[in-house]
């Protein structure tokens, strides 16, 4: 236990952007009834399941990184979405990062994806299935123009819009994060049916993928949901504010990660005490 505490203190003393985290040392899901615990950016998951790597409807990228775990609700969503994509002849759905076996904080790449309810899905739908080499070293397609204000017309495909719309219309989905330029294009193309657009939220990056987030499962009593997105389609002043010049702010100082939810801390303590 002393070694574990000393190791943890050493870890949190490093900048959280680059620090290794103890969650990476948990290589298998924690047994128990599935529970998403805490918030999306400060939580963990019990009873996570691995997304099957073999499917006719989707492919999992970078499987060597073992970020393909999630709450069963997330796996069910991926199956629903990829099945609908196939039935609509959109192409193969490319699955990016989900969560680690017990959730928790990544060393890099994500602040969220911690409670087993987030998944990155790439905004390209290949007609031909990718080879194992392509899956291990996938090449994203940047859909956003260099000025950040619009998508690249030659790269924008109606199948991508249809995929986002299918995801947004899923009852378990609460938010889909995309680049502001992608949200802008969706607003232009949506037509009369705009009810799904309020779930699509502009956010930094996300130029080649969408980040889908599910609601807390009803039986995950320690899971913390976000507030519901504002009413409306989000295509007005809120969206335009993303394209306005921003005044530079003071460089933020280094911050330590917030305290873990007690159940997540207990999970870590029990895991390392057993080693």
Swiss-Prot record:
Its main location: periplasm. SUPFAM superfamilies: Hedgehog/DD-peptidase. Coiled coil: none annotated. GO terms for molecular function: metal ion binding; metalloendopeptidase activity; serine-type endopeptidase activity. Residues 1-19 form the signal peptide. Belongs to the peptidase M74 family. This is Penicillin-insensitive murein endopeptidase. It comes from Yersinia enterocolitica serotype O:8 / biotype 1B (strain NCTC 13174 / 8081).
């Amino acid at each position: 236990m002393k070694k574990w505490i000393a190791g943890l203190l050493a870890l949190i003393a490093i900048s959280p952007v680059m620090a290794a985290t103890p969650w990476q040392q948990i290589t298998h899901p924690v047994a128990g009834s599935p529970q998403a615990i805490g918030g999306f950016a400060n939580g963990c998951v019990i009873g996570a399941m691995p997304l099957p790597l073999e499917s006719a409807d989707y492919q999992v990228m970078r499987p060597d990184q073992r970020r393909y775990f999630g709450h069963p609700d997330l796996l069910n969503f991926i199956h629903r979405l990829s099945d609908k994509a196939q039935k609509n002849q959109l192409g193969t759905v490319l699955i990016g990062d989900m969560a680690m076996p017990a959730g928790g904080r990544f060393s890099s790449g994500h602040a969220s994806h911690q409670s087993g309810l987030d998944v990155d899905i790439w905004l390209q739908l290949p007609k031909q299935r990718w080879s194992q080499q392509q899956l291990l070293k996938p090449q994203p397609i940047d859909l956003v123009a260099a000025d950040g204000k619009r998508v690249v017309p030659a790269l924008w495909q109606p199948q991508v819009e249809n995929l986002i719309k299918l995801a947004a219309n899923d009852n378990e989905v609460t938010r889909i994060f995309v680049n502001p330029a992608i949200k802008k294009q969706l607003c232009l193309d949506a037509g009369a049916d705009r009810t799904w657009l309020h779930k699509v939220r502009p956010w930094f990056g996300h130029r080649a993928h969408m980040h889908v987030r599910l609601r807390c499962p009803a039986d995950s009593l320690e899971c913390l949901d976000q507030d519901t997105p504002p009413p409306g389609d989000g295509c007005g002043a809120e969206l335009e504010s993303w394209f306005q010049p921003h005044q530079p702010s003071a460089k933020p100082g280094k911050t330590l990660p917030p305290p873990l939810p007690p159940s997540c801390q207990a999970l870590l303590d029990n895991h390392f005490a057993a080693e």
